[in-house]
Amino acid sequence: MASSMISSPAVTTVNRAGAGTVAPFTGLKSMAGFPTRKTNNDIASIASNGGRVQCMQVWPTTGKKKFETLSYLPDLDDAQLAKEVEYLLRKGWIPCLEFELEHGFVYREHHRSPGYYDGRYWTMWKLPMFGCTDASQVLKELQEAKTAYPNAFIRIIGFDNVRQVQCISFIAYKPPSF
């Protein structure tokens, strides 16, 4: 019996993945670990008269001018203003005061589409209060601005210098005629 060994050259190619390639899609994971129904034990979501809800009446939509963020609420007193300023300081935002002598409300003189950018330009009161940690400092500046411009609208804004955006803005003082 003769045995013979035949050797043949085998060529293999290696396909190395490049640094920028992504593994192929292998399919969706099982949904067994996720709940299919979310239960809510909040009393506000129960459809019954079991809980009493207190709602604040908002101002009428006609005949009232729209100001900034909290314009649908009654004017804020000093304690409420202090709480708003403390909130923006807790968030790490930089407080700044701005005033407007003519139009503290929304109007469409230079731009016809709705939104924040509607042609209103406010003047900054001093510089932004970088490093401010106390709401009383902001309220002191507000009193100075009210004394200097008693017929102006004055608002407090909170600026996030990391994201470079204005995060909060509300009217802190309206002229006596409004």
From Swiss-Prot:
- Return the Gene3D superfamilies for the record: Ribulose bisphosphate carboxylase, small subunit
Note the InterPro entries from the entry.
RuBisCO_ssu, RuBisCO_ssu_dom, RuBisCO_ssu_N, RuBisCO_ssu_sf
The reply to whether Chloroplast figures as a keyword in the UniProt entry is yes
Query: What protein name applies here?
Result: Ribulose bisphosphate carboxylase small subunit, chloroplastic
Tell me the Pfam families matching this sequence. Answer: RbcS (PF12338), RuBisCO_small (PF00101)
Q: Record's Gene Ontology CC terms? A: chloroplast
**Additional record remark:** The basic functional RuBisCO is composed of a large chain homodimer in a 'head-to-tail' conformation. In form I RuBisCO this homodimer is arranged in a barrel-like tetramer with the small subunits forming a tetrameric 'cap' on each end of the 'barrel'.
Q: Which organism is it from?
A: Glycine tabacina
**Is Chloroplast one of the keywords UniProt gives this record?**
yes
Instruction: Provide a GO biological process annotation.
Output: reductive pentose-phosphate cycle
What UniProt keywords are attached to this protein's entry? Calvin cycle, Carbon dioxide fixation, Chloroplast, Photorespiration, Photosynthesis, Plastid, Transit peptide
Transit peptide location on this chain? 1-54
Family per UniProt? Belongs to the RuBisCO small chain family.
Q: Which gene encodes it?
A: RBCS
The subcellular location is: Plastid, Chloroplast
Record note on quaternary structure: Heterohexadecamer of 8 large and 8 small subunits.
Q: Which PANTHER family match?
A: RIBULOSE BISPHOSPHATE CARBOXYLASE SMALL CHAIN 1, CHLOROPLASTIC (PTHR31262), RIBULOSE BISPHOSPHATE CARBOXYLASE SMALL SUBUNIT, CHLOROPLASTIC 2 (PTHR31262:SF19)
